[in-house]
Amino acid sequence: MKYDFDEIIPRRHTNSYKWDSAADSDVLPLWVADMDFRTAPAITEALADRVGHGIFGYTRVPDEYYEAVCAWFKRRHGWAIEKEWMIYTSGVVPAVSAIIKALTVPGDKVLVQTPVYNCFFSSIRNNGCEVASNPLVYENHTYRIDFEDLERKASDERVKVMLLCNPHNPAGRVWTREELMQIGEISLRHNVTVVSDEIHCELTYPGHAYIPFASLPETVTGHAVTCISPSKAFNIAGLQIANIVAPDEEIRRRIDKAININEVCDVNPFGVIATMAAYRKGEDWLDQLLAYLQGNYRYMKEFCTEHLPDFPICKLEGTYLVWMDCRTLATPSAELEHRLTREARLWLNAGAMYGKEGEGFMRWNIACPRAILAEGLERFKDFIVHKT
């Protein structure tokens, strides 16, 4: 392997949200979704060149940026994005919030598929809307969509938007074309706009191809809006950059107004440079990263099968977030998170933060050197041995 993903890079005392948020330095953080790997060399080299210039004034988004994004998605995913459809923004979470603001009024409902990314809930409620849930069905260590329930929920006249997570965090599903088609047909039938968070789109594994929702026929997608970013795949979340893709001109105008309502979307020069480098020169690094992450998942699956048979993990089709079933402990997940942090010195995410359907589950971030993952699994095993 050309890139050394086994290298352990100290991250404490770098103001890392992941590593420096714990009160004690011996807590192993396998929680929030950023990776413990250096980003692609092409990105660090491009950033170093930009830093060397020494002037960091107001920045515009050049045509080359849009060309790099469009070329990447066309080549790698077969999705033809037009430059005019894109809105630059500082992240997917503020993008989702602005889209909800643009497409709803207070009192409307926004549909989600729980368990789901926790920031969806705050983005909905902070805009004065209500959360409507289409719970995913957990069976055989994976999740499927209850389409009958989705039809019922979408038929509510107060439901105006559906937030789709594709690939899905934390379930690890990569929705198939057939599943996405059904979502589109139901949403279109009930005049519900699909807003697809596709931030994990590059992180899929063999046999599970990412299908951009908006790449489906327009007769299915309607006025769909998509949020994309290189931040997860290339580990550049701190550079705060993302794109909204909205083919419909009127919807795009409303979203652009909502984003700029507080005039807080100035361009980050480093995010622009990093994105262009990632999409132009980062593909080989990404492919090797995916192979390493797949190896981490295999390692964890084998470890759990041998040492933690009562704690099955979901089949991982995409993302680097593994969903573990801990219901055998009959312990609320928030309490389990607290006890693991205090007693095992291991920080995982409590499943309940992703909706009540996540209660009893824990989310692991396996985007780290294998030695760190192994240490985390040993700590979890020791905790279970002493607890039981």
Where are the regions that the model predicts?
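PLP-dependent class I/II
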Residues: 4-6, 22-28, 33-49, 81-82, ...
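An N-terminal-biased, well-structured beta-alpha scaffold segment characteristic
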Residues: 11-25
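Conserved N-terminal alpha-helix of the aminotransferase class I/II PLP-enzyme fold
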Residues: 50, 57-90
